[in-house]
């Protein structure tokens, strides 16, 4: 585990070279096809050296939940173990890790008709009105979900309309816990400035690699928009806004870097409260040896 730009992929590839393991990606951005540059997806050479499972598995127009990830990850883990190898889970989507290790509440699946109904209400009344609705039926969830978080707000309302039970009621029950023993590592630089510099350097490298053209191709499709989870990935939203003429190029670069730093901060907040973690320093020469020592 680790924040974005902390060196997770590089360390994982080295582990695959030294240890009989296979990588399972735990990243909510890498699941999307045709989103390669802005997600820092491992390139062809890296994937040839160390294939990553659960990368490029859905179209950007599709939805993919933490429950979907848990189901798919468990299947991949079972397959890897059946061949006598060790699964190596690598990524920074903490909600996926949490869902995998702790199980999930038995929430209803997505209902497109209900989602369209909620979206239409939001268009007509505004998200604040829908947040007021949620406060009436589920004040606990309303306290946790900001009116400016349409994805979580819509999901809370959808759950209630589909099941007749609130999100708070349903989340009191968890599904099966993780059936395997794990050794958990987190990698990050101890100096936040180092991480900030890495984030800035990487985003500027993405731009040099053609990130703007990548977003242009996605934007040219008629089925993608900024309300989709795929297009809310850091960098993509800001570049889309630049291509729409809402912001200039320099502002786009600044906003994307700031958004990525904020993502890293949230990831680190999760990790600081995570139990039983073995911490690694980004770029340290002994990281590989430390992982090998604790994994025996």
From Swiss-Prot:
Keywords: ATP-binding, Magnesium, Nucleotide-binding, Transferase, tRNA processing. It comes from Shewanella pealeana (strain ATCC 700345 / ANG-SQ1). Substrate binds at residues 4-9. HAMAP family: IPP_trans (MF_00185). This is tRNA dimethylallyltransferase. The keyword Ribonucleoprotein does not apply. InterPro entries: Dimethylallyltransferase, IPT, P-loop_NTPase. Disulfide bonds: none annotated. Residues 27-30, 151-155, 232-237 are annotated as: Interaction with substrate tRNA. It catalyses: adenosine(37) in tRNA + dimethylallyl diphosphate = N(6)-dimethylallyladenosine(37) in tRNA + diphosphate. Signal peptide: none annotated. Its cofactor is Mg(2+). Pfam families: IPPT (PF01715). The keyword Phosphoprotein does not apply. Belongs to the IPP transferase family. GO terms for biological process: tRNA modification. Monomer. The record marks 93, 115 as: Interaction with substrate tRNA. It is an enzyme of class 2 (transferase). Catalyzes the transfer of a dimethylallyl group onto the adenine at position 37 in tRNAs that read codons beginning with uridine, leading to the formation of N6-(dimethylallyl)adenosine (i(6)A).
């Amino acid at each position: 585990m680790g924040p974005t730009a902390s060196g997770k992929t590089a360390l994982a590839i080295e582990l695959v070279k030294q240890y009989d393991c296979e990588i399972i990606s735990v990243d909510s951005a890498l699941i999307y096809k045709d989103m390669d540059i802005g997600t820092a997806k491992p390139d062809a050479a890296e994937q040839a050296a160390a294939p990553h499972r659960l990368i490029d598995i859905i179209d950007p127009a599709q939805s993919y939940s933490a429950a979907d990830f848990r189901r798919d990850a468990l299947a991949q883990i079972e397959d890897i173990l059946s061949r006598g190898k060790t699964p190596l889970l690598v990524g920074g989507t903490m909600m996926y890790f949490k869902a995998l290790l702790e199980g999930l509440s038995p929430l209803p699946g997505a209902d497109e008709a209900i989602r369209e109904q909620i979206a239409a209400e939001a268009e007509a009344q505004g998200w604040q009105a829908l947040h007021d609705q949620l406060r009436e039926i589920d004040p606990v969830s309303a306290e946790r979900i900001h009116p400016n978080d349409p994805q979580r707000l819509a999901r809370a309302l959808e759950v209630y309309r589909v099941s007749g039970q609130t999100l708070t009621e349903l989340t009191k029950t968890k599904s099966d816990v993780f059936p395997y023993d794990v050794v958990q590592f987190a990698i990050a630089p101890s100096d936040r400035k180092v991480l900030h510099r890495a984030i800035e350097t990487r985003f500027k490298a993405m731009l040099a690699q053609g990130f703007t053209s990548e977003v242009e191709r996605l934007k040219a499709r008629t089925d993608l928009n900024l309300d989709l989870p795929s297009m809310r990935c850091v960098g993509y939203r800001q570049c889309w806004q630049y291509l729409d003429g809402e912001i200039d190029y320099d502002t786009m670069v600044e906003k994307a870097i700031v958004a990525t730093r904020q993502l890293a901060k949230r990831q680190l907040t999760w990790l600081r409260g995570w139990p039983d973690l073995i911490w690694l320093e980004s770029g340290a020469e002994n990281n590989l040896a430390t992982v090998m020592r604790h994994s025996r």
